[in-house]
Amino acid sequence: MAFLLHQARFYTTVNHLRDLPPTVQPEIAFAGRSNAGKSTAINVLCNQKRLAFASKTPGRTQHINYFSVGPAAEPVANLVDLPGYGYAEVPGAAKAHWEMLLSSYLATRSQLCGLILMMDSRRPLTDLDRRMIEWFVPTGKPIHTLLTKCDKLTRQESINALRNTQKGLDAYREQGVKGKLTVQLFSALKRTGLDEAHELIESWVRPSVADEKSEPVAQ
């Protein structure tokens, strides 16, 4: 999948549900608070510097951006960059539009096979992060959390952040949530967790390939 993600290109941008592309390829959505490092993480995962753009004004971008991955003639999946959330100075009308767009997309998009949720490792699981989770968990599809900027933490702080976030996610399972809720440390700067994230996305997009890799080789 690393090589597959490295074949990523801009596909389209969407501001209304009616404009979502009529594609059939599986989609992986990326969500996170403004300044959680979402655009940087996407660029590192795709081995590009300027694929996903971060607005200089947090909360300014309110569009859904699509990036196709795989061969240009026959893309095998789409990465979907959702608008960042949580910036206090965004006008009320923009917040309402963001809430409608994201909640409807996450709840109803049949092509969506999983959600990558970006959280700053220094302050994970805010109320808005929980809202994103609660919009998506009814689908039964997996959510994988990247605790970004973990290079800014000490080893013990990283352990605590990982443990506390997993505990928060486990609470949803105790409520009967069926989809997988997993978490890992990630640093775009140090490339920490890059291989793990690649492998997980591969298992979502091409589960048959991932299953073959996990099967023991016959002797």
UniProtKB/Swiss-Prot annotation:
Occurrences of domain EngB-type G (ranges): 24-207
Coiled-coil zones: none
Residues given in the record as Mg(2+) binding sites: 39, 61
Keyword Nucleotide-binding: yes
Cofactor: Mg(2+)
Molecular function as annotated in GO: GTP binding; metal ion binding
Keyword tRNA processing: no
Keywords associated with the record: Cell cycle, Cell division, GTP-binding, Magnesium, Metal-binding, Nucleotide-binding, Septation
Gene Ontology cellular component list: cytosol
GO biological process: division septum assembly
Binding residue positions for GTP: 32-39, 59-63, 81-84, 148-151, 186-188
Function: Necessary for normal cell division and for the maintenance of normal septation.
Assigned protein family: Belongs to the TRAFAC class TrmE-Era-EngA-EngB-Septin-like GTPase superfamily. EngB GTPase family.
Protein name: Probable GTP-binding protein EngB
Organism: Burkholderia ambifaria (strain MC40-6)
Gene designation: engB
